[in-house]
Amino acid sequence: MGDPNSRKKQALNRLRAQLRKKKESLADQFDFKMYIAFVFKEKRKKSALFEVSEVIPVMTNNYEENILKGVRDSSYSLESSLELLQKDVVQLHAPRYQSMRRDVIGCTQEMDFILWPRNDIEKIVCLLFSRWKESDEPFRPVQAKFEFHHGDYEKQFLHVLSRKDKTGIVVNNPNQSVFLFIDRQHLQTPKNKATIFKLCSICLYLPQEQLTHWAVGTIEDHLRPYMPE
């Protein structure tokens, strides 16, 4: 008898080869759920938790232009970006969400969350869950960490301030697993014109090989630390 892990790996490799012929990715064989928590520095203040209304998987190479644009803008290095493009990486796009607060019912909207200038957010945490398509099994937590700390995205916003882009602004966390698509807006105040950066969508990067790496616990277990009252 062969090793179960070896058999599983061979089966996944065969599936990947079949999918390549069909120009599909392994991610197309899964359903996903994603939640986004904005964790505040003030520990007594509960996180702002949102459920993503639809998670859209896309293969990395379809977004090659955006990654290379980030290199040109010095957002991240050419070496790390080429490494990213050479991997079988799946992008999981989250364009819309709804609040998990009990007093906000059924309100799905385009992402619209002011990230800067403000200093009360400690980090953004994304929680990803998946299951095989057409499965009745519960969603399981994907064993990967998706966090973006305030200090890391603020540095990039300050860099972007000197440029004129209004749209097409993308910032990423140091290990390039979370990408934020940002909209720059100007507000006229009585004294001057202020620049604000709003989050308009989120994209997670996950190597295909990690799609079948699940942690233990339910959705409720993993959301509990971030749930609003």
Swiss-Prot record:
Q: What protein is this chain from?
A: Uncharacterized protein C6orf62 homolog
Q: Which organism is it from?
A: Pongo abelii
Name of a matching Pfam family: DUF4566
What the entry lists under PANTHER family is as follows: BA1-643, SIMILAR TO CDNA SEQUENCE BC005537
